[in-house]
Amino acid sequence: MSTSKRKIEHLELCAKRPVESRNVTSGFDDVMLIHKALPQIHMDEIDLSTDFLGKSLKAPFLIASITGGHPDTTPVNAALAEAAEELGVGIGVGSQRAAIEDPEQESSFSVVRDKAPNAFVYGNVGAAQIKEYGIEAIEKLVDMLDADALAVHLNFLQEAIQPEGDRDATGVLEMIKEVCSLNVPIIAKETGAGISKEDAALLKEAGVSAIDVGGVGGTSWSGVEVYRAHDSGDAISEDLGNLYWDFGIPTVSSVLECRSFVPVVATGGVRTGLDIAKSLSLGAYAASAALPFVGPALIGADEVVSSLSKMLNELRVAMFLCGCGNINELRTSSKVTVTGWTKEYITQRGFDPKDLDIRSDL
């Protein structure tokens, strides 16, 4: 199957089928922001703006990589980009592999920069494709978008389940090091299985500028592949995908694992502004989500703006109730507790819950 056809299949499945984690959550329910009964600030004067990788954002949010690579995905990316431009948030594109294989698909990606000339836009390529296509081809992906950064996605769980997946991860860290020589920041991005502190240390050493943890709790790409396998009659891949549907490190745990190495983006089950606030209070520099905007984007930009505006208003309320007048205060001064499964996990991983308030300013 061509990459382009697979991309439209993925989009349709995410729009129509239940693809989120089944039995493992992101961990946000284990996180409690300590309420300030005396916030002593005006809610309407709270400043959501922040800087991320040298670019100013009106709010600490990125519309995560969703799609591209098929003509039918162009209006979806256009709607997302228009919303990003209007609200001043960042936006990523789906894997640009299809544009390497077929230059006619470039417009499904470049429309994002066309519709969002001032936004923080990041490109996207799989780690496996760096080895396959080489650094010059990857550089063209940056130029295609006039991108402010490039995400290198680590989706080896999906590759292991996908019948046509690339299962060769040899030399991947060296390839990432090579990509880090490009003249844009590189974001190492998991796609639903999270990143550990051990891998975060290796990625920092390789030269990445940020880590998007892509933890368990949101879209399960193993789950997406279950539907593809079922529809094609591939019972072995279907069973394998079901077994690994919830495999990996949940988002909150992964943020705590990675936060001391490089700036972190919290992705994976972020569904409300309260989730964004909790992410930043744990040390993330921004939060991100994709699935909540698929349905709205299929309708149009106004629907995306409405959905995202709701989340940003929820973030503002959370900041007000924590007495935080700006994003830096939320990241460095808010008080937070972690209980339940997440506390047990981070304790076993050597993280002292008493150190939650010690957040690095990287």
UniProtKB/Swiss-Prot annotation:
Disulfide bonds: none annotated. Keywords: Cytoplasm, Flavoprotein, FMN, Isomerase, Isoprene biosynthesis, Magnesium, Metal-binding, NADP. It catalyses: isopentenyl diphosphate = dimethylallyl diphosphate. GO terms for cellular component: cytoplasm. One of its GO terms (biological process) is isoprenoid biosynthetic process. Its EC number is 5.3.3.2. It is found in: Cytoplasm. GO terms for molecular function: FMN binding; isopentenyl-diphosphate delta-isomerase activity; magnesium ion binding; NADPH binding; oxidoreductase activity. Substrate binds at residues 6-7, 95-97, 158. Coiled coil: none annotated. It holds the Pfam family FMN_dh. Mg(2+) binds at residue 159. InterPro entries: Aldolase_TIM (IPR013785), FMN-dep_DH (IPR000262), IPdP_isomerase (IPR011179). FMN binds at residues 65-67, 95, 124, 189, 219, 269-271, 290-291. Gene3D superfamilies: Aldolase class I. Transmembrane segments: none annotated. Its cofactor is FMN; NADPH; Mg(2+). Involved in the biosynthesis of isoprenoids. Catalyzes the 1,3-allylic rearrangement of the homoallylic substrate isopentenyl (IPP) to its allylic isomer, dimethylallyl diphosphate (DMAPP). Homooctamer. Dimer of tetramers. Belongs to the IPP isomerase type 2 family. This is Isopentenyl-diphosphate delta-isomerase. It comes from Methanococcoides burtonii (strain DSM 6242 / NBRC 107633 / OCM 468 / ACE-M).
